[in-house]
Amino acid sequence: MMLQRTMIVGVVLIMATGGVMGRGRLPAQAGGRGAAPQTTAPAGRGAQPGMNMVPEEIPLWEGGAPGALGSAEADKPTLTIYRASRRSSGTAVVVAPGGAYQNLAMDHEGRQVAAFLNSMGVSAFVLKYRLGPKYHHPIELGDAQRAIRIVRSRAQEFAVQPDRIGMMGFSAGGHLASTAATHFDNGKPGATDAIDRVSSRPDFLILGYPVISTDPAVAHAGSVKNLLGDNPDPKLLEDLSNDLRVTPQTPPTFIFHTNADTAVPAENSVRFYLALRKAKVPAEMHIFENGPHGVGLSLDDPALSVWPTLLTNWLRGRGLLTKPPA
């Protein structure tokens, strides 16, 4: 019998955690949640099979991003492209690392995740989005939407299918991904920029220990403050509780979380899952009994390390790991 307890579609298991602590500041993890953002692979790390050894970084906007408050690297949102170098499935994922909307865990929630996706034949696009407290909503959402539009508008160039573009996010990056999945548009036909004419809706969604709600009972206070500043409008808070924004058009979703997460409690994932279920959106959720916040791929944890396999099975079951016929 597996040691971890898992929540799967149709089964709800919530265990007492003895209270929620430390929601204002995410704990530092070995993967570098508190480290400065990285946009290229760290030196000395070997690539996994199927990973593109020469990632390409591109700006989200040529000539500067709208709403930029300076010209430093933090003012320049980018995508780092890791193309699947073999057995490409034609599927793409935009990856949003976490970091409480203040930092970006570009290694263990960015590059390492890209390597894992490449190993399945999935091309990865790691998003460096703008952060608080300098930038607030809707800047972050605009960066995420732009990333999805870029991949979709250049799908042929990237050797991916325009209807197989997902978004994956961890922690606060999970909030950004779920916001993109619940606040999308179908494109702006009259836009001067051709990229803005295509849809910003992700075709599927992958969430790792995500921030979902702005409800103080379960929210990560630091993420909310960095995203919205002090004293945000109550209507905006409600609008960005993404469990309240789920509709039948929300994309199919895979979620994993840990019951022992005291920074971002699992109720965030539970609320989103139940909203998906109510809207009859295909969804799968796994709640593991143990494990801290910010675990990434969890390669060193015998129990948690099964979640990438569960995700692989979910993607395969949805036909996303098989290259479509020419």
Segments the model singles out, each with a brief description of its role:
Residues 97-102, 259:
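Active-site glycine-rich loops that stabilize anionic/oxyanionic intermediates
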Residues 89-99:
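Short beta-strand element of the alpha/beta-hydrolase
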Residues 255-257, 261:
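Short beta-strand/loop motif that positions the catalytic acidic residue
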Residues 20-51, 326:
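Disordered, low-complexity segments in secreted/periplasmic proteins that are enriched in proline
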Residues 105-107, 111-112, 126-162, 298-306:
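Catalytic nucleophile-loop/oxyanion-hole region of alpha/beta-hydrolase
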Residues 146-223, 237-238, 242:
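Primarily recognizes the serine-hydrolase "nucleophile elbow" in alpha/beta-hydrolase
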Residues 82, 256, 266-326:
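C-terminal catalytic histidine-bearing segment of alpha/beta-hydrolase fold enzymes
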Residues 39-87, 91:
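N-terminal cap/lid segment of alpha/beta-hydrolase-fold proteins
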